[in-house]
Amino acid sequence: MYPSDKWTEQELQKLEKRLADVYKQAGKELDGKARNYFKQFSRRYAKEYAAYQAGKYTKKEFEAWLMNQYGRGQRWEALREDMARRLTESNEIAAAYINEKTPFVIALNHNFEAYMIKSLMPDRQIKEIGDIAFNLVDEHTVKRLTVRKQKILPPRRVLKSKDVHWNKKKLQNALLQGILQSDSIGKLAGRFQDVTGMNHTAAIRNARTAFTGAQNGGRQAAYEEAYQMGIDVVKHWTATKDLRTRDSHRALDGEEVPFNMAYSNGLMRPKWNPGGSL
């Protein structure tokens, strides 16, 4: 593994641990809220469930009763809104963590790639070009550039109203599925953990996408700097051979093009943002 790839992966693992803590806490809070909500129905549930078991109600009638009790009214609306906003808050924290780390990943990969370009250049070419001096950057430099021109590092953002709406819909679906599966009150509360898991999975995916973009963006910046000094640079597409990699990206593994040309799939690099500079 390329040293900078290894370092980037280590940083990603640290970030993923922080994200896991964020959603673990959110899941714990949601579970407590849900259990308190369903607890108020426990006596009535036991009575009506016994009647259902005795044949007083059909399964469909019992499900309708449960939905009227659990999934409608102001108390449920308030709980669902509260839980959805708590999950969106977690997503905002996750986005902030990602935005905090990506400048470091850009700087790390830019500086290492600059070092590799200079190290691998033959003495003859160095004599022809003359002094070779890359501008090494740190994460603070990258952040300052981002403030002046956001396209350099488009930040991860959470569209709050849209995110809350999505979570409310998923929470409603989780409750409905639990009722249709005849879940107990305890299991119904546990259903909402699946929604927390969906948000956690999305955050991990966003982190990996952002890190890959930052990694390749940092390298591309080093190539551009080398080109300005008269160094011919060729970039090489390396694809990870796992299920997270698109088939079209895996097919490009090993393809080489001049650094300022697009690959055969039209991308300048993996995770390329056409509107950005990196």
Walk through the language-model features, giving the residues of each.
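Acidic, glycine-rich two-metal-ion catalytic cores of nucleic acid-processing enzymes
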Residues: 197-198, 202-278
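N-terminal leader/targeting and assembly helices and adjacent pre-domain segments
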Residues: 1-197
